[in-house]
A protein has these predicted regions:
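N-terminal secretory signal peptides
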Residues: 1-31
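Extracytoplasmic "Venus flytrap"
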Residues: 43-70, 76-86, 106, 173-179
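An alpha-beta-alpha
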Residues: 64, 150-195, 199, 287-309
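Flexible loop/hinge segments that line or gate small-molecule binding clefts
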Residues: 117-143, 248-258
Length: 343
């Protein structure tokens, strides 16, 4: 794995295209604007706007590291890339011979697509709020559709809230966050139908102090359970002696008396499918969102760990029932992308 905050511009686009074309023609694999069939390992680069320790990005990074350890990819990444620099870093990786570029396009949707259009022989797989475009065949999208696991954590949270006052703190009210909050709230209502919700967004993907201060305010306003969509929330919960629900990653090891349950996002099914398609030369404009769902192994409820045996049995019975129904297709968690509101 190579960490590459910035890449040299030593290889020009003309030289790169000539080299790639020659190699592909030699192998008999050149197919014009279609992403090339790749030999192992696939040169894969990731562009992240936040540190790799951040919840969401850490799951992509983890999957990429695992793929490199298997020998499937040769992985480089840039973290803390500003939105204004994002397209530039994408181009630098493209000019340096990378076959697959992954990352998050939420704040640079148009710019990312423009870069992909310039490099039709490279496969791009980026987190996005929008669907793929047929006229951009090398640009696929993904998202964290872990609403099933979020719903299950809500069932648990509702059963453990004495006050019925629950706080939810997120980064931005975008569909990727909104749907998880709504699913969590729906789960809460299963075991605590009269629950009240305080909802707030801190306007950042990585600002633990801001998340912590927002959590303090909610606790002061009566919340005894917090949905920690961002880092910092569980710190406040731990300090004030209230409970929290984790999102995307399992942080219970750091908060053993605070984090009751977590909805886990596994990026491996998404990345592995992209790797398979790049190898086969079949990568195309596609929505990979389904690979984040529980049925595909992209989401799961983390083990209760220190809270095993502390959740009411009735709630756990419902969790197991719903989990089985989700896996069989008999229950579908509603996907609501509208901004959630306090009530």
């Amino acid at each position: 794995m190579t960490k590459a905050p910035t890449l040299p511009r030593g290889m020009t686009r003309r030289r790169f295209l000539a080299t790639a074309a020659a190699a592909a023609l030699t192998a008999g694999l050149f197919s014009g604007a279609r992403p090339l069939m790749a030999a192992e390992p696939i040169k894969t680069a990731a562009v992240y706007t936040v540190p790799v320790e951040q919840q969401w990005v850490s799951r992509i990074h983890k999957a990429a590291v695992a793929a490199q350890e298997r020998g499937d990819i040769d992985y480089a990444y840039s973290e803390n890339v500003s939105n204004t620099d994002y397209a530039r870093v994408m181009r630098e990786y493209a000019e340096s011979g990378y076959t697959l570029i992954i990352g998050e396009a939420f704040a640079v949707e148009q710019e990312a697509r423009e870069v992909a259009a310039e490099y039709p022989e490279i496969a791009f797989l980026l987190g996005s709020s929008f669907k793929p475009e047929p006229d951009l065949p090398n640009f696929a999208v993904f998202d964290n559709y872990i609403q099933d696991a979020s719903y299950l954590t809500g069932i648990i949270a509702g059963s453990l809230s004495d006050s019925g006052n629950i706080g939810l703190i997120g980064g931005f009210p975008i569909p990727e966050v909104n749907r998880l909050m709504h699913a969590f709230m729906a789960g809460v209502r299963e075991t605590n139908p009269d629950a009240k919700f305080q909802v707030s967004f801190i306007g950042s993907w990585f600002d633990p102090p801001a998340a912590k201060e927002t959590a303090y305010a909610m606790i002061e306003n009566g919340a005894d359970m917090l949905y920690a969509e961002r880092f910092g929330v569980s710190d406040a919960a731990q300090e004030k002696g209230v409970l929290a629900i984790g999102n995307v990653i399992d942080t219970q090891a750091d908060y053993p008396d605070t984090v009751v349950a977590s909805a886990i996002w596994n990026f491996e099914p998404t990345l592995n499918m992209a790797i398979e398609q790049v190898k086969a030369g079949t990568f195309k404009a596609e929505d990979y969102g389904r690979f984040s769902m529980m049925k595909e192994g992209g989401a799961e409820l983390a083990p209760l760990g220190t809270f095993a045996g502390k959740v009411p049995q009735e709630a756990m019975d419902l969790v197991e029932q719903r989990k089985a129904e989700i896996m069989s297709g008999d229950y579908t968690t509603e996907v609501n992308d509208e901004e959630p509101k306090s009530n």
